[in-house]
């Protein structure tokens, strides 16, 4: 994608940038940002969803729980990770790890990059809606600092299930919306070919969402996009995480939870 296109990116071009197959995924950022990472598997109920990776990480001698929705770097890995569309067991695995973080008082860092939760019959039979709803409830009251970063696509409830947090950040050319532009166009106009038009009215860019105070900060991408300089992008994210933790350091638990609750209660006042 040309530098000129990046520079003048409108909403639809940002959709294309966010979906770029060369864009760094959650696995890359976890390995690049943290000094050590031990992956943990399974939801202790059905299985291990490869679309969500999570575990315990170290950064500057501090322990974290890290969870990320992960796309693949090639076709084979994309099939393994279901193109970043989690099943309910993925969301339950994520919640299991975050409740473990609460037990051991570890901050939680989430990376979000998904077109949406998987909507296959099996996923619905295993309680996809319930799994997402349970995450929303539990994250709102999780008794540790929570940071969520949208690194590519933030699609619908599948993204929100890992994005109820004290601090929500978006990369400069990422998107976050209730559904895809194609889905919006299909529902509203019965014509998915009008996706570009839909993107322009949906207010899905980081810049739009920051203006509504839905997110807290936009993390600047290297010139040409995150995929042009992944190492630099990881450094920018790392710096932002450490700054956010510094801001929350010393905040008592009641204040942390009240501010998190009010953050979401007040969103309607900004729309």
UniProtKB/Swiss-Prot annotation:
Assigned EC number: 2.1.3.15
Molecular functions (GO terms): acetyl-CoA carboxylase activity; ATP binding; carboxyl- or carbamoyltransferase activity
Primary location recorded for the protein, binned into one broad class: cytoplasm
Subcellular location: Cytoplasm
Catalytic activity: N(6)-carboxybiotinyl-L-lysyl-[protein] + acetyl-CoA = N(6)-biotinyl-L-lysyl-[protein] + malonyl-CoA
NCBIfam families xrefs: accA, AccA_sub, PRK05724.1
Protein name, per record: Acetyl-coenzyme A carboxylase carboxyl transferase subunit alpha
Encoding gene, per UniProt annotation: accA
